[in-house]
Amino acid sequence: MKSSDNPLYQRAKRFLMRRTNYETFVSVPYDKMEASLARVRDFLEFLGAPQNAYIIVHVAGTKGKGTVCGALDQIYRAAGYRVGLFTSPHIDDLTERFQINGAPCDKTIFAETTSLLIERWKAFRREWKRENVGVKTLDDPYDDAAELQMTFFEWSLVIALTLFARAQVDVAILEVGMGGRYDATNVCYADVSVLTSVSYDHCEQLGDSLDKIAREKLAIVKSNAPLVCGVGFADFLYGGLDDFKRREELASATSPKGASLHALSSEPIDDEEEVDLNDEANETSESPTPVSAPEREARKFDEGRRDRPEDYVYIAEPEHIITHDDVLRIRELARETAREHNAPFDVVEKVSSFVASLPQPPLDSVRRWNFEIATRVVDILAHRVVAPERRPGANDPDATRRLPVAEEAVRAAAERFSMPARFEIVSRDPMIIVDGAHNRASIAAFMRAARERFPKAKIKALLATSIGKDARGMIAELAARADEVILTERTRDARSTPLPDLIQIHETLLDETCAENASIRRKFHVAPDFRAFLIGYCARPSGGNEILCALGSFYFASEVRKIVKKTV
């Protein structure tokens, strides 16, 4: 039965979609979320604490958290465990947020569970009302005016935790929605907490400095539960090669005086050489070109980087560059937080020889770093008995156990690793990749991965951003790293940055940073109707060594992949 023919599923979906959904908001009232955690925690307690029926891994981070969650899910499934995976946003269908053993939740089971929880919510509200006479509340969960209503994300979490208990999963992987401190997922006691990375995103809510952002994310750490910190190589890489001062020292002598232009010399791409991008053998992991000692020093956290051609320049904005000192400071902050909670602490400083031996593709250096984070979690849960005091039936020896995983399971997961809208190749003729990269750091990470896997390709970026995101930073990265940039907008989505605004941001940025560099300006074009552009692009003969990369948000990635799959 199609989901559109399942009235119970449609009713449950309508109920969820009518809840307050901060994912659709341009500005999120972060300071009001603390009160929300109490009602979620109380409701889960009323339900019998379904989250205590399985091991939980809780993953936060500015970027990389979705990939780490996906890696853990695929590793544990390869090892034979039953796994629940809660992530956001969904790409095509709502049930993708609630995955059990690698598949979206069955729609009928989802609908039945949601209906049951609605009735339990009514009972919970009636009991709460009896105990809190005089407090304004409504029993009807369908009434949007109810001030004490749980939000879309809160309901989604409760549904997920209940589904996982019903499915008797061995382990649940929970991805933080935003931040950590006031995220609904933080009501759960996690057996392992993970901080994948820290960079600039959601600054309005989390703070305008890396330390403030890190503290909000580290608030997920629980007493006696290990913390794995992945802040390091990946963050430093994403933010740039090194701090702004070193960039200036390495700047080309021909850069305009006073402009933030930083050229890194290398061999140019041979535009005449065409490469068959459909041949996966051309997805390479070649060693980098040798560089001078000073430049090698500047790249000490950028191992394996493919050099850019001479006309590539890095448009640096010092306040958004993550330095080596930043990385060390955030690591120490994570260490202190773990110490305060009596939590064992593990920091990822380099990729192990085992993870380094995993296949490429599908693992580029960025994914490899995230796989390293995942394997640290796997190692902890393979040797540590999870907290027995929090589980029902704690006297039962089967209520607490380890999760041993063989290396063969990790290797098998790596060999077939893939995730929707995360460096997802949706077409090979023409070659089109979609990625949900939606901040400066994730754009830089994507471009690094693309250059590693397709070193001789011409990379054309199609960019549509959301209001409130760092469009300037994303454009700056693409100006530095892509061969061509096409600015567009999601015309049917009020959250999309209007194309005229993107054009203005682009013009202002280039005027301020590279006014005399015509090659940068020639990279940029506009596509007022990205749907028409995509249909036309798919219909034309393949560009040989050209790759079209749709970037800027998961919502844009979702739309592009649907159009491409219908067209190609």
Feature locations, PLM:
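Long intrinsically disordered, low-complexity regions that are acidic and Ser/Thr-rich
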Residues: 243-316
